[in-house]
Amino acid sequence: MDKIIDITNSSPKNYIRYFSDIFERGLTMSYGSGEVSMCSHMLQTAYFAEKDGATPELIVASLLHDIGHFGTDFSLDFSDGSHKYMLSATKDRLHEESGADLLENLFGLDVSEPVRLHVSAKRYLCTIDPKYYDKLAETTRHTFKLQGGNMSREEVQMFEAKHHAEAAAKLRRWDDLATHKERKIPNFEHYQILLEKLLKVEV
């Protein structure tokens, strides 16, 4: 397999190619219960966002919400069994922060901050609705514990006060629905024009 595109000191156009490359190669990397790939999961999340009439920024956030896993939880050799690695993890690697930091520079806060908050949104939803936890995939339950578990009352209030909290909660709900193997969804190219339009600098 060829080396993934190098984005060190890269142009915005190369970032789009980088994302496209990840979505193509990452189709072998399992997610959740192992029935879907990580990239299919992200595409499904974007599908739900678009279906529900989300803003363009939130659709892109949904599409790229787990991009921070690559290079943190998952190496870029794109080997299979990633969900098994997540089940055995003993430390939270803050993929939401890695992803959001990258996306903020490219697309701005309306894309980056729902991504940054989507882990907190899981904790929030499980706290305000205890039945929500029962809907989570096995790996998501495991990482929930690593990420802090249920929120305190103060944490709930702090989350609700954040500007992008509502968007993050919407993203999280789509995120947790996006685990079906047979669902027919658009591919990455379906979103490429939208990605290029939202870039903060010229492609």
Regions inferred by a protein language model and the residue ranges of each:
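Metal-dependent phosphohydrolase cores
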Residues: 1-203
